[in-house]
Amino acid sequence: MIIGTKQEFENLADYVLRDYLGSEYESYSPFNVTAFAEEYLKLEISFFDFNPEENIEGMRIGNKIILDRRLCDPIRVGERNFTVAHECGHEIINWQDPTYVPYQITNYRFKNQHKELKTEDDFKEWQANVVASCLLLRPNLVMWSMDKFLKADKLTVFGDCRFYALDLYYFKMMARYLGVSQTCLFYRLSRLGLLDHQPDSAYDPRKDVLYR
């Protein structure tokens, strides 16, 4: 298992992104994670009808990523992209291990798989999630999107996760443009210091209007 801090895994993802994108790194185009997986990491992506009761979103066998066909639904593009990015994260991290043999890999990704970090596998999943969010949401793209959609340097959050209605509307539009889930975007905004955390008591319903 590769050991490292969150910052070190974020730096690793950024290094790989710059190598793959070149001058396009500074562009404002959403990241095509499928093309990255196939062109840069040489992974093959296909779809399969998994049993819905098993909550499998994807699996990895050797250099093949097999996704649940339900992720083809346009409304689940964020889930699909993150699942691919998650597997890319595993691959990038595994590259750092000189004993890594890609064709011996077999694992599954389950929907809503939230675990405490107790086992080695738990930490590996956490590592892949960190890299995945960085691949999908490089800093310059996120900050440009903040200015484009929210017209602000930071997104105001009251309590744990309460927004003004208009801010929430543009936040959802931003996630849709970037091709990520709202959960992934919220986490990345937090890591980049782009959330303005306020107590619930600071929320003013008089300002909570849909249109400015």
Language model segments and positions:
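Active-site hotspot residues in diverse enzymes, especially metal/ion-binding acidic/histidine motifs
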Residues: 1-212
